[in-house]
Design a protein with these regions (language model features):
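Functional beta-strand-loop-alpha-helix junction segments that form "active/interaction loops"
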Residues: 1-27, 32-34
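Surface-exposed intrinsically disordered loops and tails
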Residues: 2-5, 39-62, 157-180
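Short, exposed beta-strand "edge-strand" segments with a Pro/Gly-rich flavor and a Y/T-containing core
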Residues: 6-7, 61, 127-130
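Catalytic cores of nucleophile-dependent amide-cleaving enzymes
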Residues: 24-120
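Active-site-proximal C-terminal subdomain of hydrolase catalytic domains
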Residues: 77-182
């Protein structure tokens, strides 16, 4: 039978970490170095950090402590900036400090597509047991470099600007156009 989830899922997610002790935690949606907005497109709580501690903050501003020391892999596959360690008090370090994260990946720039995050999910989760987390990251990295070399060869020769984005828009190869990329 179908069940209805609470409008604010912050407490349920905090309890998942604290009580159920998952070995893998996957998130997506809007994030910064200081928070993860659970709902993104709808009203919900958030995960935040302070003094190296990760905590949930629900829509009533109730702070929910996260203490989940069991080792886990964290995949913020669709979260901008979750991997950017710009100072001591940031989400990546709080996940490691109070949520037991031993391995994670994370974007250091804003992203909307996230080939590396979603690709690692495919190799690591969608093909269970075939790759370790590190192997999934490496395999996906090779796939990304191959895709760039095949579809946008000029891209690999361009230096990045301060934003991490290429200075010039690279031309698409004939293979890219045949694949429907525009």
């Amino acid at each position: 039978a179908q069940q209805r989830a609470p409008d604010d899922t912050t407490q349920a997610l905090v309890e998942t970490l604290n009580v159920w002790h998952p070995g893998l935690f996957i998130t997506s949606g809007h994030a910064t170095e200081r928070d993860w907005q659970i709902g993104y497109g709808y009203r919900n709580g958030s995960f935040r950090c302070a003094d190296g501690q990760l905590f949930g903050l629900d829509t009533r501003d109730q702070r929910l402590a996260i203490d989940s020391p069991n080792p886990k892999v964290y995949l913020p596959i669709g979260n901008c900036l979750m991997g950017n360690i710009d100072r001591r008090d940031c989400m990546a370090l709080a996940w490691m400090n109070s949520a037991g994260v031993h391995q994670m990946l994370g974007y250091t720039v804003p992203t909307w597509y996230g080939y590396m995050g979603w690709g690692v999910l495919d190799y690591f989760v969608e093909q269970p047991g075939r790759y370790t987390f590190s192997e999934a990251f490496l395999a996906n990295h090779h796939a990304l470099v191959h895709r760039l070399a095949t579809y946008c060869p000029e891209f690999l020769d361009q230096p990045s600007g301060d934003t991490g984005r290429p200075r010039l828009r690279p031309a698409l190869s004939d293979q890219a156009k045949a694949a429907g990329l525009t």
